[in-house]
Curated annotation (Swiss-Prot):
Keywords: Chloroplast, Plastid, Ribonucleoprotein, Ribosomal protein, RNA-binding, rRNA-binding. Part of the 50S ribosomal subunit. Binds to 23S rRNA. This is Large ribosomal subunit protein uL23cz/uL23cy. Signal peptide: none annotated. The keyword 4Fe-4S does not apply. It is found in: Plastid, Chloroplast.
Length: 93
């Protein structure tokens, strides 16, 4: 579970759930094969395809000092029909 940070819930990612595609942010140093192996092992599913893209870090400013956050990678994981991943929503109190 080292590679996957958290699941992403945006309008597009919720729409992709209908196509059996799950979206999550992963560590920027992780490879596609590592993430695929981990998802298949942990959730017991079969992965058909994985698409990834790297999102740039956002600019931040504290007084006169300018900086930016770290970039991260987002994966869209497509599963075989009949398989699904349980919801990854944490309960907030």
């Amino acid at each position: 579970m080292d590679g996957i940070k958290y699941a992403v819930f945006t309008e597009k990612s919720i729409r992709l759930l209908g196509n059996n595609q799950y979206t999550s942010n992963v560590e920027s140093g992780s490879t596609r094969t590592e993430i695929k192996h981990w998802v298949e092992l942990f959730f017991g599913v079969k992965v058909i395809a994985m698409n990834s893209h790297r999102l740039p870090g956002k600019g931040r400013r504290v007084g006169p000092i300018k900086g930016h956050t770290m970039h991260y990678r987002r994966m869209i994981i497509t599963l075989q029909p009949g398989y699904s991943i349980p919801p990854l929503i944490e309960k907030r109190t």
